[in-house]
């Protein structure tokens, strides 16, 4: 992916972020968040996930968006339209619940889960459009609002987290507290980006 982005070619890339290797059975990956249980991380992943959007934005010439259809359909469509009209590499990262997350209530709750992820500050929506820099405007637009729901309550609504709480309650508390702090710091960082440019 990095090689394609670095090529500078006019290409649109869509990443469905399931936070695991979904196509091979749900193994932990660089996208798996801290505290989540997955294959090869049965006692909870102990390091935070890679910030793919942040890495792509460092190029400065890549259109980057994080979207969450269940949380903000209009932001999602706007990102698609902007990415398509951008002449250069564009990357859209969509929060995509999958069966490996163990959503309580099942996959029928996927759109509701996406909405709750944004409300809890678990996932953030934003757009980075390099064209705005050329126009003297801020290229970074934070679309999601400050979290209004409880982070821990959200993650404990998924088996990949609640199973850690059942098996290793003390460890789960420590990892979940760290994960909540990381999410809080991430939102603060994004609000600074929205003012920085």
Describe the residue ranges of each PLM region.
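Structural motif
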Residues: 10-14, 19, 54, 62-65, ...
């Amino acid at each position: 992916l990095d090689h394609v982005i670095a090529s500078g070619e006019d290409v649109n890339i869509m990443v469905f972020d399931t936070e695991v290797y979904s196509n091979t059975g749900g193994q932990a990956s660089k996208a798996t968040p801290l505290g989540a249980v997955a294959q090869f991380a049965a006692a909870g992943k102990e390091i935070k996930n890679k910030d793919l959007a942040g890495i792509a934005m460092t190029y400065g010439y890549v259109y980057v968006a994080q979207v969450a259809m269940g949380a903000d359909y209009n932001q999602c469509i706007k990102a698609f339209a902007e990415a398509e009209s951008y002449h250069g590499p564009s990357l859209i990262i969509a929060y995509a619940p999958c069966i490996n997350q163990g959503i309580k209530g099942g996959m029928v709750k996927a759109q509701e889960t996406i909405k709750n992820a944004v409300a809890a500050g678990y996932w953030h929506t934003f757009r980075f459009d390099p064209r705005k820099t050329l126009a003297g405007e801020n290229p970074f637009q934070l679309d999601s609002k400050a979290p209004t729901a409880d982070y821990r309550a959200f993650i404990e609504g998924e088996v990949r987290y609640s199973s850690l709480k059942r098996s290793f309650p003390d460890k789960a508390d420590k990892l979940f507290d760290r994960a909540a702090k990381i999410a809080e710091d991430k939102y603060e960082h994004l609000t600074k980006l929205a003012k920085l440019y």
